Regions:
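Q-loop/switch helix immediately C-terminal to the Walker
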Residues: 1-9
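Conserved ABC ATPase "signature" region
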Residues: 5, 16-34
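Conserved ABC ATPase signature
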Residues: 38-42
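Catalytic Walker B motif of ABC-type/P-loop ATPase nucleotide-binding domains
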Residues: 63-67
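Hydrophobic anchor residue at the start of the ABC signature
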Residues: 52
């Protein structure tokens, strides 16, 4: 709660709006039970939820997530994927995710792209992208084959 309050005081000048936004993100990310716990004592998944809550305080139009699934257990990854999907469905926010874990990423996006040497190699829906030979070669190497 202290983190949310401190950041909101910087980015949201209006006290009433600040309080509304804090209450919204606390509710949205189910942080009620964690209000009295210092951030350094939170689990990895709880910290990810807090970071997303902090990012959404200012109601951004674009949210950039750099390797959000790194160092998380399977259950926490699933929870984070659900949060990302819900955010996409409930708001007009554009979420850009950069991650090396294709399986985790493709489970929660509408469109994905593979970059190689700063160039887009393939861009498509997740279901089409996994079938794309150029994407497979760029991601796995030329010697990778799916039978």
């Amino acid at each position: 709660y202290d983190n949310l309050k401190a950041i909101s005081e910087i980015i949201i000048p209006d006290k009433n709006l600040r309080s509304q936004r804090i209450n919204y993100v606390i509710s949205k990310f189910e942080l009620d039970s964690l209000k009295e716990i210092k951030a350094k004592y939170l689990s990895g998944g709880q910290k990810r939820k807090l970071v997303l809550a902090l990012a959404l305080l200012s109601e951004p139009k674009v949210l950039l997530l750099d390797e959000p699934f790194a160092a998380l257990d399977v259950l926490t990854i699933k929870m984070l994927q659900e949060i990302i999907v819900n955010l996409q469905q409930e708001s007009s926010i554009t979420i850009c995710i950069c991650d090396h874990q294709a399986r985790d990423l493709l489970a929660c996006v509408d469109v994905a792209m593979i970059l190689s040497n700063c160039k887009i190699i393939a861009q498509d829906t997740p279901s089409n992208l996994v079938k794309n030979i150029r994407a497979q070669n760029a991601y796995f190497g030329d010697s990778f084959k799916i039978n």
